[in-house]
Amino acid sequence: MDATNKQYALRDRAELSAFVNQPFRNNSRIKFTCFDCSPKYFVFGANSGSLYLYDRITTSFLAIFPSQLGTIGKVSISHNEKQIAIGNQTGSIGILSTELAPSTDGEGQPIDLGGPAFVTSFCWTEDDRELYCGDSRGIVSLIQFSLFMGRNILNISLHPVLLLENRIVQIDRYKDLLLVSTLSKCVLCNTAREEFKQIGNRPRDGHATTTTTTPSPPLMIVDEEDVRIFCSRPGSRLWEADLEGNVIRTHQFKQAAAAAAAQQQLQCLQESELATAPTEAPDGTLMVVPFQVLYSIRRQLLLVHDRCQLLIIDPLHSKIVLRTDEFTDITHVAVVDEWIYLLTGENRVFQVRVEIQGDEDPFPTPGMVDEPCLESRKQKQGVYILDSMLNNNNNNNGKQMNGKESPLLLSTEATIKEALVSVVRGKYGRNIKQMFMGYEQQQQQRTPSGAPERPKTLNLTKIYEPSRSNAFANGNGHALLAEFGIEAEVEDLECDDMMEELVQTRTGQALLGTAMPNGAGTGKQQPGKKKFSTSLLDGYETSEDDATVRNLYLIFRSSIISNLNFADRYAKIFDEYDTETIVRLLRKLETLMEENEEPNARLKCMRIYFHYLKPELLWEIDADSRQFIKDGFIVCNTTDGADRARLERLAHCAACGYYLEATASCHYREIGTSLLQYYWSRKEYDECFAMVKRVPYLWRTITRYYIQDRREDKVVQCVWNLADSELLERAAGELPFELDHWRQLFELAIAYHQRHEMICLSCDKPTGGRLEDNQPESQFRQWNYLLGVALAHIRSPTELLCLVRRYADNIPRGAIAPSFYIRCLLLEAK
């Protein structure tokens, strides 16, 4: 029966409170704080820290599991129903075994999340050997464990896999894909490739939840392209996305309050399609249900709720099929098959069943799917599905397939016309077109020996270029339909206007080709979708550089979304190439980032590489690569807003533009000093000072080279400008400083304090402008500190006293402590 003729109802409503509360009927202080259910069990967490286990079918009490974890905040039963994950409200996680006798240490080895955090969501993997848990800090962690002799859970380890900004609301999983929702966004994680993608671009303020729904067509043959992701949005809206994380459409479920009042009773309700725009009641009010956690019923319907309402949605047809407000104070909901279980206030538990009228088998079990038929269907891709239908029709009269009815012929008559429609209009149409175009391309590129030469890079424009001799290419296959008297649908024509891209960008550009609609002469680019991968083009070869750049960019995007450091993944790629090749890849990666409108693309590329680069390699690479690294080092220290603000606060020479002082630190210091050391050793001083002019921290390295080379004409000025105690003491001891050096230093100090003047370290011209006084520099420029260092390195204290007396008129009264004179007299007496 068509979905528009189905009717939905809530049946078998019952209250289970009397059975559930039986174990502690005489203790009113125990309250349920959470619960979960499976085909076999109910499990309730309580404020006492204990877990209560029940049989779901008979509602009989089975066992109590005491624990020392305190109030339980979250529970989750594994798929095999042998383990229960529990999390308390103070950040501890425990794993219980339902097959062990209850004991005080039933939770095995509790894990502490650390910090002020608590578990907000659990998600088991299919084999139940791993458990994902999300907490209130926005961290998703993977718990791996094993059972030892069925006695205790050992070797539990906690590995953070995703770091987000705020609380995790819900986690769901489909094969290798992990869906994580927070209060502001939804993230799709490919756990096999360690790739992360945010679903949609607009953040939300509230519970952003996700779930996957697998539609159930009449043949029960589901392709991955039919699996959908649904994310809740503010204002009773849902985002529908595919498994690549691309938002397909938005569902609006606002309804007028007056209209909602007519659907409050618990009975069979005819589904009604909602308008795209919200309707208003006569008083102008709108009924908005805040979608929090999404539950899937048989992976076909969606269940959402608030404190007093249940809504059941058919997401494929964008309809609310059931609504009831009979229950109040709903705190927790769980779903098993078509059964819905509710935990409300005062320890009340209800059950209700979803029924579809007009459907012979609304919820078939997975076991009813014929495995041979399913496997046979999976093996037929592209043109082979057409061949299968024709062969079955001719050889078996369209009725038998491996001794059973063919699932492809159960719902439709297999005619050539219908087969061609399904192939050309369906998802295989472009595959067929690419097969023919690929063959034509090979025929045109045959070598003199007669063997076809496959292109090294994929030229998308050439692949999709129409050919008069190719019916599939001419009109995207619609010419073939026209021969059979079949009209192409408008949506098919619109879909074919857009060409597939290898690496889709936000601006509609691709890495190896540009997606242009028909009539590309207009100059407008068609925005495309961002994907994890482009499986449609997997059959074609790309250049090694382009494939590597794509991988680097995917890793980069994953690191941005997950807030994790993928240095090991970058290193695995870079280890396969020499420096010259890596530089070439980074330049291409920068171009790709710019096409995707990534701000500061050069900065991000260099940070990726500098986390991998070993400074000692700078002595062995070619000049072009070294120049690239030098420029990247400057970019890393001058691009970020905080770095620019720090540089703007520094005084600089009005004549030559060099900074008069140095910053306290810099990024990638070892790389910068290694570059400076390389150029200095080869007397390439212009390269050195070009770096110093942009990154003034390197004045410290230059000063060390001055001390090493005994450049007495530069050392005193550098030491004073940099206000570095380590450099002053090193210079005073290694040169060593004589009386004349101290005289120069005192004159620089007097010029600074009286005229706010400093000497440029590059052009030796005096420049006005007082430096900002920070605590280390202020202490360095005090007379007591300078005289203390001088007294420790000068030969005769009497000479130092004479020098001080010479500049007595320029030294403020009280600037020199009496203890200095006492020390001079004591040293002279010795």
Curated annotation (Swiss-Prot):
Q: Which InterPro entries match?
A: Beta-prop_HPS5-like, HPS5, TPR_HPS5_insects, WD40/YVTN_repeat-like_dom_sf, WD40_repeat_dom_sf
Question: Entry's Pfam families?
Answer: Beta-prop_HPS5, TPR_HPS5_insect
Q: Which domain of life is it from?
A: Eukaryota
Cellular component, GO, one term? cytoplasm
Q: Where are the WD repeats?
A: 25-64, 67-106, 114-153
Q: Does the keyword Coiled coil apply?
A: yes
Q: For this chain's UniProt record, which GO biological process terms are given?
A: developmental pigmentation; eye pigment biosynthetic process; protein targeting to lysosome; visual perception
List the residue ranges forming a coiled coil, or say none.
578-604
Q: Which keywords annotate this record? A: Coiled coil, Pigment, Repeat, Sensory transduction, Vision, WD repeat
Reply yes or no: does the keyword Repeat apply: yes
Q: Which family does it belong to?
A: Belongs to the HPS5 family.
Function (record text)? Has a role in the biogenesis of eye pigment granules. Eye pigment granules are specialized forms of late endosomes or lysosomes. Biogenesis of pigment granules in the eye requires molecular components required for protein delivery to lysosomes.
Q: What is this protein called?
A: BLOC-2 complex member HPS5 homolog
What is the native source organism of this protein? Anopheles gambiae (African malaria mosquito)
Q: What gene does the UniProt entry assign to this protein?
A: p
